[in-house]
Amino acid sequence: MPKSEIHPTWFSNAPVLSEGKTLCSIGSTKPQLQVDVWLGNHPFYTNSQTLVDSEGRVDRFMKKYGLQTKDN
């Protein structure tokens, strides 16, 4: 028999919210869950991700130390 009044309250239909919209309902110890990033607004999944070009850093290093690349 479990001890009484030591277990958290269980909410079986706690809504998961993002930007004011309900995404889904799950079981939780909190009555409502708020998420900032999810599948619908993450840059990787929405194809709005930008790539960082680091080629300039290598060129600056080679120039700074007077090294020749294979192309030169």
From Swiss-Prot:
Cellular-component GO terms for this entry: chloroplast; ribonucleoprotein complex; ribosome
MF terms (GO), sorted A to Z: rRNA binding; structural constituent of ribosome
UniProt-annotated location(s): Plastid, Chloroplast
TM ranges: none
GO process terms (BP): translation
Record keywords, A-Z: Chloroplast, Plastid, Ribonucleoprotein, Ribosomal protein, RNA-binding, rRNA-binding
Pfam families in the cross-refs: Ribosomal_L31
Protein purpose: Binds the 23S rRNA.
Record text on subunit structure and interactions: Part of the 50S ribosomal subunit.
Family: Belongs to the bacterial ribosomal protein bL31 family. Type A subfamily.
Protein name (Swiss-Prot/TrEMBL): Large ribosomal subunit protein bL31c
Organism this protein belongs to: Thalassiosira pseudonana (Marine diatom)
